[in-house]
């Protein structure tokens, strides 16, 4: 799948955002290994800590469908430069994707930053850290 199509899918997802408090809609499109695209948008709550970001929504939809292998992620928002995922989203992305997987950060003006999972969260906490602790 080409990058532009994945970004277009993230823009479609953004249209579904539930953002009555921040008025800051974000969309994500997650490309699974089998070619399926999982859409995510941010979903706010009056108890702010219950809010879910677009990236995590896309991953949770895919994982709840039994999908564990992914090829790319695109995220979009109406920001000055390409939007950047929060720390919680970076950790979830790192949980399910290899470090070299491409992540496309963009905005509505068409600016695109291509990065990788490893660059988003160097030194991510992982299952290997848990394995080490269990061995002690």
From Swiss-Prot:
Any one annotated GO CC term: cytosol
Hydrolase keyword on record: yes
Enzyme class: hydrolase
Binding site for Zn(2+): 53, 86, 89
Active-site residues annotated for this sequence: 55
Matching Gene3D superfamilies: Cytidine Deaminase, domain 2
Stored PROSITE patterns: CYT_DCMP_DEAMINASES_2
Highest taxon listed in the record's lineage: Bacteria
UniProt keyword list: Hydrolase, Metal-binding, Zinc
Hydrolase listed as a keyword: yes
Catalytic reactions on record: cytidine + H2O + H(+) = uridine + NH4(+); 2'-deoxycytidine + H2O + H(+) = 2'-deoxyuridine + NH4(+)
Pfam families reported for this sequence: dCMP_cyt_deam_1 (PF00383)
Segment forming the signal sequence: none
TM region positions: none
A molecular function GO annotation: cytidine deaminase activity
EC number: 3.5.4.5
Cofactors: Zn(2+)
Ranges for domain CMP/dCMP-type deaminase: 1-128
Residues that bind substrate: 42-44
Biological process annotations from GO: cytidine deamination
PANTHER family the record matches: CYTIDINE DEAMINASE (PTHR11644:SF2)
Similarity annotation: Belongs to the cytidine and deoxycytidylate deaminase family.
Entry function: This enzyme scavenges exogenous and endogenous cytidine and 2'-deoxycytidine for UMP synthesis.
Protein's name in the database: Cytidine deaminase
């Amino acid at each position: 799948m080409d990058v532009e199509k994945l970004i277009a899918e993230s823009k479609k997802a953004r249209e579904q955002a539930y953002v009555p408090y921040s008025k800051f809609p974000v969309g994500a499109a997650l490309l699974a290994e089998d070619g399926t695209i999982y859409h995510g948008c941010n979903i706010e709550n009056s108890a702010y800590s219950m809010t879910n970001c677009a990236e995590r929504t896309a991953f949770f939809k895919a994982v709840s469908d039994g999908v564990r292998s992914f090829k790319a992620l695109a995220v979009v928002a109406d920001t000055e430069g390409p939007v950047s995922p929060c720390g919680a989203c970076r950790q979830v992305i790192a949980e399910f994707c290899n470090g070299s997987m491409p992540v496309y950060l963009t905005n509505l003006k068409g600016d695109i930053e291509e990065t990788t999972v490893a660059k988003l969260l160097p030194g991510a906490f992982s299952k290997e850290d848990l394995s080490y602790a269990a061995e002690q």
